[in-house]
Amino acid sequence: MEKISRTKIVDLMKREDFGAMVNVKGWVRTRRGSKQVNFIALNDGSTINNVQVVVDLANFDEEMLKQITTGACLSVNGVLTESVGAGQKAEVQAREIEVLGTCDNTYPLQKKGHSMEFLREIAHLRPRTNTFGAVFRIRHNMAIAIHKFFHEKGFFYFHTPIITASDCEGAGQMFQVTTMNLYDLKKDENGSIVYDDDFFGKQASLTVSGQLEGELAATALGAIYTFGPTFRAENSNTPRHLAEFWMIEPEVAFNEIQENMDLAEEFIKYCVRWALDNCADDVKFLNDMFDKGLIERLEGVLKEDFVRLPYTEGIKILEEAVAKGHKFEFPVYWGVDLASEHERYLVEDHFKRPVILTDYPKEIKAFYMKQNEDGKTVRAMDVLFPKIGEIIGGSERESDYNKLMMRIEEMHIPMKDMWWYLDTRKFGTCPHSGFGLGFERLLLFVTGMSNIRDVIPFPRTPRNADF
């Protein structure tokens, strides 16, 4: 076979030098035709679009042609030709074909459609489908957008540890890391495990957030962001929860809650705009195949300012809805941690645009959030989105050493684990703010997928750690 430099299909579709010899490589999506001519849809993953390879059967070995089945991997040399078919600008008239890899007839991805549940069982193969090819290309582009946004704004990308001895959220739902023999654990007289001989000499876990360490960096570098994996050992089998997911967490010195809200709104609009501008084919495919309102919803986020509303006002709106006959599964009252149905009512039914809810009761928020003058609420903010509910959670951080100490004691957090965090309030404290965005929740919104397990390559959920 003549050696010709490979052209990615995404680039081939932009070429207009018809008559040129080209090489394309990829996997067979479909093969159809007559006794004289076959049409092979070839895809290499660079785009949602296939290239049509036209094969004059008289010019090729019959035994080789038998190997060209759905899923087979081919290298094709041929002439780039202007296509007469609808929906494609160019096709390749095959001159030489090499089968790089045959595909066994047990290949589970055939032309017929497959359920999402089935595709999760074969997560190692599902990136080959149109749907997951689109999702994972968008995932890549969203990661690029995140780094680009923060770099352009002068933030520093800061790497926080995956293994930690602190519980940022105070929830205690952490995966433990140990080298100890689980069948022969050393315990003290109270029956508590002794970690002196463990690898780190203390109890260690996988991180639930890089925020606390991010705050340390922000009080030195000014503006930082983290972007990495986080872990929650919650036994939650829902379409919105994963045990392993990715988080983006900016922290900014001297920003108060207002600037924090401004940053969150600007950031998420940037990401949505990036998806529309740079993933148009993939977004359109997902809009047409899964969620007919996807593009309209994405464009809607960009059109208007987000509503900014105190938690107390949000509760009043929800209580008025109940009084008028609206039924929620979970009760509404001041002090409740809002459920997704409450958040979505505010966004989808009442305001019909994204909402930033602020000033939450301190009892339902984390210890590090700055307390308001009323003593009841904290300067927290949650960004609520249509279809998703909460997509961003953040706050202005408590910068007063004594108030932070008091809050840590109130929540019975061991002081021995917090000395390093308190040092930032002891040595040149400053106002600072930040937030966390669950990457997969952003992807749920941008792709229109309905289950968070379908926007991460290999989902980690209770009783599932395959691949």
UniProtKB/Swiss-Prot annotation:
Its EC number is 6.1.1.22. It comes from the Bacteria. GO terms for cellular component: cytoplasm. Keywords: Aminoacyl-tRNA synthetase, ATP-binding, Cytoplasm, Ligase, Nucleotide-binding, Protein biosynthesis. It is found in: Cytoplasm. Coiled coil: none annotated. It is an enzyme of class 6 (ligase). Its main location: cytoplasm. PROSITE patterns: AA_TRNA_LIGASE_II. Belongs to the class-II aminoacyl-tRNA synthetase family. This is Asparagine--tRNA ligase. It comes from Bacteroides fragilis (strain YCH46).
